[in-house]
Amino acid sequence: MDDDTFEKYRDSDELSKYIRGKIVNSDMYYILIDEVQYAITKDELKNPENIRLYNVLNGLMRLRNVDIYVTGSNSKMLTKDVLTAFRGRGDEIKIYPISFKEFYSLEGGDKSDAYEEYALYGGMPLVLSKKNDVEKMRYLQNLFTEVYFKDIEERYDIEMPGVLSELTDDLCSSVGSLTNASKIAKTLQSVKNIKVSSTTISRYLNYLIESFLFSNAKRYDVKGKKYFEYPSKYYCTDIGLRNARLNFRQQEETHIMENIIYNELLCREYSVDVGVVEIVETNAGERTKKQC
């Protein structure tokens, strides 16, 4: 829909008329609409309940011989928006950056060298088409700044963009470390002299997760079989984007490997938590408890 060839069909009524005109019999039809947010007007964005496109999609889904797939930019249409619009009749298909196994099947060569390349530039598919390191770095940095960050700022009307930027840097530089909104807020105040509430930090963390830049693993009490509300570990959805954000500095091998393994487990549809076990130790007659 981002191609001007299809500009006419950004009008929801025209789109509906065009698609229905192609459904001429009882055969199965598969409809794929990419960048579907172009069919949503600015006025409709202000009043999501009036988005005409959702009615068009729901109408098509009622047809027994139609299977419809839509994708959209994060800033205009997140997964939860689509699922809400489909009123329980839609399914989410999670597509991750390519795994190391997929990367190696395309890259080939020495496996150790391939892993070093993957640990540096990650698994965004277009990275493989870039001819040299400079092009790869530039692509990932532009993708982070011009696509992901702009999506977040446009969708959520960020009132403190500087805080969002500092928060993102903090998460990227400490992947795999336990943290929470209060801790981050205190760090920003003491190190950067930025006063911000933990509530704002918590809200921004959710924005980063909803926009698929990060995901988090909650702490789970293995013995008590319960989740701790905080702290959690945060991981970048793609390690190449993490490195690009940090200008390819801070190449901490163990943290990067942990992030890659975490992403691999998600790709294999595992639910990943941070296990916590409480241990009681006795020293000089005194009993102490610690978590590990």
What are these regions (language model features)?
Residues M1-D27, I51:
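Short glycine-rich substrate-engagement loop in P-loop NTPases that contacts/grips substrate
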Residues D4-E7, Q37-K42, M77-L78:
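Catalytic P-loop NTPase motifs of RecA-like helicase/translocase cores
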Residues D13-L15, L45-E49, L53, L83-G88, ...:
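Short, glycine/charged-enriched secondary-structure capping and boundary segments
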Residues G21-S26, G59-V66, A85:
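Conserved catalytic network of the ASCE P-loop NTPase/AAA+ motor domain
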Residues Y29-Y30, K233:
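The start of beta-strands in P-loop NTPase/AAA+ ATPase cores
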Residues L32, V36-Y69:
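Conserved Walker B catalytic segment
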Residues N65, S73-S75, T79-L178:
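Interdomain motor-coupling "hinge/lid" segment immediately C-terminal to the ATP-binding subdomain
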Residues D133-Q291:
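Accessory nucleic acid-recognition modules appended to NTPase machines
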